[in-house]
């Protein structure tokens, strides 16, 4: 089985040795602000807003963290780690291949709908944020394993593949944060999965 998202995510910011106390304080403020702003507005939130939330200048932000991707990776454990572990644990607590895959899909869609940052992560909008992509790939690997298990159990149509699972989650991620998306998008997603079950 897939191991839970690692707790050993490194802070990807460039932190000089013996950082001055005020610089350390600024770095902690930036991390806290990034967690808050990214979670509320997604990973594309203006860095100026994060600097403002932290009470520092945008120059200080760039000096301390370097880039958006480095800042994203610095807060991966707080944004994604615990949530993806919870998703994994709830999924694997189910007692059948079908219920595991159903739970995985439902939990993933709920996470995408409720958390703009996680939705951006699952849609891989920042592929250079290496730690974030790695965390998401571990969850997608779990999804692929669940599809294979459902095939082996004879409960899922063979022509419903991992690519179909990714397409379902992509559609949910795009539609859930698009004000122009048709109101019935979730029904379409659910129906596309329901049609693939054999038992």
Question: Where are the regions that the model predicts?
Answer:
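Helix-turn-helix/winged-helix DNA-binding modules
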Residues: 42-43, 63, 157
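Short linear capping/connector segments at secondary-structure termini
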Residues: 120-129
């Amino acid at each position: 089985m897939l191991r839970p998202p690692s707790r050993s995510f490194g802070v990807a910011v460039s932190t000089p040795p013996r950082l001055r106390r005020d610089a350390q304080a600024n770095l902690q403020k930036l991390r806290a602000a990034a967690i808050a702003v990214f979670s509320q507005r997604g990973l594309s939130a203006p860095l100026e807003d994060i600097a403002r939330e932290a009470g520092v200048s945008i120059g200080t932000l760039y000096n301390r963290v370097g880039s958006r991707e480095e800042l994203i990776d610095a807060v991966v454990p707080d944004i994604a780690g615990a949530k993806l572990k919870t998703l994994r644990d709830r999924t694997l607590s189910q007692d059948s291949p079908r219920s595991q895959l159903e739970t995985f899909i439902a939990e993933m869609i709920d996470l995408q709908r409720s958390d703009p940052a996680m939705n951006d992560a699952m849609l891989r909008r920042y592929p250079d944020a290496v730690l974030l992509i790695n965390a998401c790939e571990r969850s997608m690997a779990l999804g692929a394993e669940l599809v294979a298990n459902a095939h082996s159990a004879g409960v899922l149509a063979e022509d419903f593949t991992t690519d179909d699972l990714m397409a379902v989650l992509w559609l949910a991620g795009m539609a859930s944060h698009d004000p122009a998306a048709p109101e019935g998008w979730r029904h379409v997603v659910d129906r596309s999965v329901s049609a693939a079950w054999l038992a």
